[in-house]
Amino acid sequence: MSSRNDWPLIPGTVIAHSSAATGKYIGSPGLAILPDGSYVAAHDHFGPGSSEHGISETWIYRSTDRGTSWSPSCQIDGAFWSNLFVHRGALFLFGTSRHYGYAVIRRSDDGGLTWTTPTDSKTGLLTNTPEYHCAPMPVVEHKGYLYRAFEHRSPGTGWGTNFTSGVFRAKLGADLLDARSWE
C-alpha cells in the first residue's frame, strides 16, 4: 500500500498504483462514504495486461481515517466500469460484468468486505444480453426513483453509430438486485 511519502508530487493519498510495465492500468475510479463515516474506493483494471474482455476485476479499498490511509478490502471478479453508491445503509456496485458485458449490480452489507454475486435476475444480473457500456457515473435519486445512465451497443454497425444511450431506474423501496425492479 502506498503512503503519502511515496508520491511527493501528488496531493493527498495514493490508494493504488499499477506499473505501466504490467499493461494493467487503473480505471473507473469511484468513492463512497458509508453511514459510519468510513470511505470506500473502487477501481478496475484495463489495458493489454488486464482481463477486461474476460473475467474483469474491480478492487475495493477502505479507509477509516477520512482517506489518510487505505487498506484493500477485496477483489471482485466480473465487475467493470462500475460505480459505488450507498442506498438505505447498504453499499452497491453498479456497472457491467466485463468490457461490453451484462449490466450487473452487487450489494455489500459489511462496508465492502463481501459482495453479492449476480448469477441470475434475482441476484443482480439485470440484463439477459451483453453489450452494455458505461462509466462510473453517479446514481441519482429524484422523485422516488434511483437513476443510472448506461449505453448499449450493436456490434457491426460502425463505431459511434452502434451506441444507444439509456437510463435504468428503480423505485426507492425496490429490491435493487431484482432485475424486475429496474425499468
Predicted features and spans:
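Beta-rich carbohydrate-recognition and catalytic domains
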Residues: 1-28, 32-81, 85-135, 140-183
